[in-house]
C-alpha cells in the first residue's frame, strides 16, 4: 500500500532534510525508568541528518505544483487550500502513562514505549502505511464524528449486500435507472463535458440533487415531489400540473405571460414555506435522507460492477454515465469513495473493451499495463520530496503506520531480551524509518546495547545502501555496535545465503505490509526459507481485508466496504475542505482502489488477506503464534490517546492486535516463531 510507493522517492538528499542545530550538539546518555517524557525527548535529537525529517507540521513548498492528470479541478482546489488547513487534527495530547514496574525488564519496556511516544510527536519515524476489516469490540462509544452515509449504509439493518458477497441479489436496478433518467429535467441545465467527472456542476448542486428525492424544498410536500421525480409517467405529471392550475383559479383564463408570472410567484412562495418548515424538521430526517442517497450510490456501484462482471458492457456504461453525474472527489466521504470506485470501474471497462475478443472476458495484462496500471502510477507527483510529504500527512494524521511499527518493534525488543548479538532482517527497508525508535530502546537497555546487525531488503540496491548509511550514522551517535547489510532483490528472488546468517545471533524477521504483494506461487517458498533460518521472532503486519478472492464482484464489495471506513477516518481527522486530505486520497488510496478493481493477473498486486487467512498460511509453514504482550497493548492505547478522534478501535484476537475505525478493522499485527 503506502510503503510500496514510498520507496519510489529513493534516497533523500541531506540538504532536503536539514536538522535543527541542537541535533548536532547533543550526545547520548543512558535513561532509566524514572526519566520523564521531557528527559526522554533528548534521545530523539540524536537522529542523523538523513533520518531527521522536517517538523511534522510543515508547510508544503509554495512552488511545488501537484496536478493529477485525471481532472483539472485538482489544480485549482490545491492552490486555494494548500496553506490553509494542514494537519488540523494531528496528535497534540500530552499523555502521562502509568509508572514503570520495578523490574529492569519492565523498566526497559516502559522506557521504550516512552521513547516511541516521543518519536511519534517528533516526526523522525517512517512513511510506510498499511491499509485494511472485521468487527471490533470496544467499550468505548463513539464521541466524535458519526459514520459517513456510505459506511452507515453498510451498517444498516436493511442492508442486504453484505449477506451474500459472491451471490448478490440486487434490487430492481432497471427501475432504479429509469428513476435516475427521470431526472433529466433537473440536469438539463448542467453542461455535460468529456471530463473525467462528466459534468461541470457545482458541488452544492450535486449534493442537493442526491437528496432531492426526500427533500421538501422544491415545492408542495415530500410525497408530491417524490411523485414528480420518480413517477416517470406523463399522465401523473399532467394531473399534478392541472391541480396546480386549478389551485391558482384565474390562471386558466389569463394570458400566457400572466400565467407564467403567477406560476413563478407560486413556486417562490412554496419554496419559502418549505424553507421555513425545514427549520423544524428533526435532524434524524436529514440523516435518513443522507443515508438514502448513500444507498442509491451503493445500488448504482454494485449494479455497475455486476454488469461489468457479467460482460454486459453497454449496461455498465449506462450506470457509469449516471454515476459520473452524481459523484465528486470533493464531496463528503460517501461521494469521494464512490468517485474513486467509479473511476476504477471506468478503467476496468475501458481496458476490457480495448482488448476483449468475442470469447474473452478477462483483462489482458498487456492492456492493463498501458491503461489502468499506468494510470495508477501517473497520479503520483514526480518530486520525491513531495511524495514523502504526502506520506508524512498520513503518518501524522492517522495512527495506522505508527501502530504497525511500534507493535512490531515491541515484539522484537522483547524477543531480544538479554541477547548480546542481534540480527534484524527487514523485508522492506525503504528509508529505514521504523528503526530509530528501536535503536534508541536498545541503547537504553541496562548493561548497554547489544551488537546490532540489520539486513535491509529492497528492489533498488542504491536506495538500500543509502538507508544503511543513515542508520549507521544514527547507531554511531547512540554508541551502538552496528552493521548494515544491503540486499537489492525482490522477495520472490531471495536466497538463503543473502541473509549472511551467523552463529550466535538472535534473529528477527520483520515484514510490514509486504507479504501480500508476493505472488502466490512464491509465497510458500519464501516462508519456508525464513523458517529454515530459525528466527527467534517473525513480525507480520498486514491489511485486514480480503481483496484476493476469486470473484471480481466479491472483491469489489469488500473493497467498497473497506475503503469507506478509511475515508470515514480521514473525514474525522481533516477539515471539510482539506487539500492535504484530498492529496492523500487521490495519490495513495485511489491508486490502490484502481489496482484492486481495474487490474487482473500479474498487474493486480494489492492482494490483501484477512488475519485468519494469514494464520492458516503461517501455521501451514510450521510457524506458531506468539501472543503480543500487555506492554504492546498498553503502548497501542497510549498511541491512540494522542489522537483527538474517538473513532479508532483496538481489539485483541487470539494474541494478535487489530486497529480499526468504528466497527471495521483496518490493520492487523501478529508475531510468530518456529
From Swiss-Prot:
It comes from the Eukaryota. One of its GO terms (biological process) is response to symbiotic fungus. One of its GO terms (molecular function) is sequence-specific DNA binding. A motif (VHIID) lies at residues 422-426. Its main location: nucleus. Residues 598-673 are annotated as: SAW. Residues 288-673 form the GRAS domain. Disruption phenotype: No visible phenotype under normal growth conditions. Unable to be colonized by mycorrhizal fungi, with a defect in hyphopodia formation on the surface of the root. Ineffective symbiosis with arbuscular mycorrhiza (AM) fungi (e.g. Rhizophagus irregularis) leading to rare colonizations characterized by malformed arbuscules reduced to trunk with a few initial thick hyphal branches. Impaired induction of AM-related genes (e.g. AMT2;4, AMT2;5, EXO70I, STR, RAM2, LEC5, PT4, VPY, BCP1, SCP1 and RAD1) in the presence of AM-fungi. Keywords: Cytoplasm, Nucleus, Transcription, Transcription regulation. GO terms for cellular component: cytoplasm; nucleus. Residues 295-372 are annotated as: Leucine repeat I (LRI). It is found in: Nucleus; Cytoplasm. Residues 466-497 are annotated as: Leucine repeat II (LRII). Residues 507-595 are annotated as: PFYRE. Induction: Induced in roots during colonization by arbuscular mycorrhizal (AM) fungi (e.g. Glomus versiforme). Regulated by DELLA1 during mycorrhizal symbiosis. Residues 391-456 are annotated as: VHIID. The keyword Lipid metabolism does not apply. A motif (LxCxE motif) lies at residues 302-306. Belongs to the GRAS family. Transcription factor acting as a central regulator of arbuscular mycorrhiza (AM)-related genes (e.g. AMT2;4, AMT2;5, EXO70I, STR, RAM2, LEC5, PT4, VPY, BCP1, SCP1 and RAD1) required for the morphogenesis of arbuscules upon symbiosis with AM fungi (e.g. Rhizophagus irregularis and Glomus versiforme). Promotes directly the expression of RAM2, EXO70I, STR and RAD1. Not necessary to enable hyphopodium formation or hyphal entry into the root but essential to support arbuscule branching. Involved in the phosphate-mediated suppression of AM fungi colonization in mycorrhiza. Forms homodimer in nucleus and cytoplasm. Interacts with NSP2, RAD1 and TF80. This is GRAS family protein RAM1. The lineage of its organism: Eukaryota, Viridiplantae, Streptophyta, Embryophyta, Tracheophyta. The gene is RAM1.
